[in-house]
Amino acid sequence: MSVKIRLQRHGKKGKPFYWVVAADARSKRDGKYLEKIGTYNPNTNPATVDLNLDAAVKWLHNGAQPTDTARAILSYKGALLKHHLDGGVRKGALTQDQADAKLATWIEAKSGKVDAKKEGLTKAQSDAKAKAFKAETVANEKRIATQTEAAKALEAVVEEATTEEVVETATEEANEEKEA
């Protein structure tokens, strides 16, 4: 029986969520599987991968062939590197301690890169938020300035109209006095 390590789709329409499973190559995409190895959530940025490294390496040792996307996920989490290093230990090129040390340094470097990306994304998001807030305050100041100018212009027009009325009434009264 040939075994594949592949993704099994779960989640809603438009919101995929995958299980990383070891399944018989002849079974359906979302059908029966032998073992659930982990999960993959592409909806987050960066994508969230939860993988049982030992189970994945066990299936790789047993000859399971990962699909392209599953291979990328296994590589991202270090399962392929561990499988490669275990091959070196079996051949006698490395000791188990050396292989574990190489894997640990690689995992630390990889987690540093992922953390840097997360920090960069949060920084970019906060910068965009601050820029939008600044643009909004500038727009509010302009709007308030135009409203005050319009209010002053309206006051001037009303004041001018009242002075004209006073002048008209004064001239009318003067005309009435002359006639009388």
UniProtKB/Swiss-Prot annotation:
Transmembrane segments: none annotated. It comes from the Bacteria. GO terms for biological process: translation. It holds the Pfam family Ribosomal_S16. GO terms for cellular component: cytoplasm; small ribosomal subunit. Keywords: Ribonucleoprotein, Ribosomal protein. One of its GO terms (molecular function) is structural constituent of ribosome. Signal peptide: none annotated. InterPro entries: Ribosomal_bS16, Ribosomal_bS16_dom_sf. NCBIfam families: PRK14521.1, S16. HAMAP family: Ribosomal_bS16. Belongs to the bacterial ribosomal protein bS16 family. This is Small ribosomal subunit protein bS16. It comes from Flavobacterium psychrophilum (strain ATCC 49511 / DSM 21280 / CIP 103535 / JIP02/86).
